[in-house]
Amino acid sequence: MTPEQIVRKFFEEVRSGNNPDYSNQLMAEKVLAHQIVSEEEQTVCRTPKDYAEHVREMIEVYGNFSLEIQEFLVQGSKVYVRWKQVGTHLRETDGYQPTGLPIVQMASAVYRIEDGKISEYWIQIDRSGIQNQFDFNKNLNNI
């Protein structure tokens, strides 16, 4: 598969929550995950199993969320994806009790493919936007 096909399949099967365990077909044994939180970069090492569990945790918190790819660019072994994820706040997260209201997440990542698998990625998530929604929904439920 080409880098484009690998990342598209990753989003269709794994990141979407449709088949998290398919991560073992598309991800290297150890993947460097560079995560931008505010202006601070954190790098963690993820395995396909870890990533599948991460997706299952998202499903527990946000239900069967929708995921829409808004931009998809390929340059050699790197693939850039920007997406919108919409779920329902069903479980406590980040100190916020569930509201049953929608939560929209905007995010983007660059995936690097090596030997036919995702071996590294750099991800940015609009955490401030998510925080604002949690605060707004909390106040809305307190009215």
Predicted regions and their residues:
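C-terminal and inter-domain tail/linker signature
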Residues: 1-143
